[in-house]
Amino acid sequence: MEDFMIEFLSKLQIFISKNITIKRLGIENIKNLCGVDIAYKGNIGYAVSVMFDGKDYFHKYVKGKVDFPYIPGYLFMREAPLMIKAVESFQCDLILVDGHGMAHPRKSGIASVIGVILDKPTIGVAKSKLYGDIVEEGSTNFIVVNGDKVGVKVGKYYYSIGNKVDIDDVVELSRNGYPKVLALADKLSKELKKKE
């Protein structure tokens, strides 16, 4: 990847980070909870979104060719277009994204990018650490970036603010274990990949 392209993408992420809204959503107010994940077979991506309306689970999927290479910190270029296509037609009160939100070098991981583009509340849920310090306060392990609490580490998962939520929302969501909508999106995306 050319240096000028990386520089441009970094500027784009900084612009997105300046447009993130941090405000209390209230997990208890969510009626439609969505999760989105993606699996790959070669350069074909299989993005699956799952919505839970409090009673039933619904899902949609999109597949497409992905040409952008995997570059840590720039995952959004590879995954966001298909993820957005998979989730945008659901009426989501909160979208959980497999990936980071503000726990990112430019406070603009894929969950934040998707949240700002769709103008929706998002939380990133990742299986590995990308960026930030883990600071223990009582029984809570906060993820801190540039002095700001942007997420929490619970077990092996990293939850972080994407858009239109605050740290209390992230803490509250993280107490309920790994979200079923994400587990289902992960499972279905892998099943789709195997069928092809």
From Swiss-Prot:
Gene3D superfamilies: archaeoglobus fulgidus dsm 4304 superfamily. It is found in: Cytoplasm. Its main location: cytoplasm. The record marks 70 as: Interaction with target DNA. It comes from the Archaea. HAMAP family: Endonuclease_5 (MF_00801). This is Endonuclease V. It comes from Sulfolobus acidocaldarius (strain ATCC 33909 / DSM 639 / JCM 8929 / NBRC 15157 / NCIMB 11770).
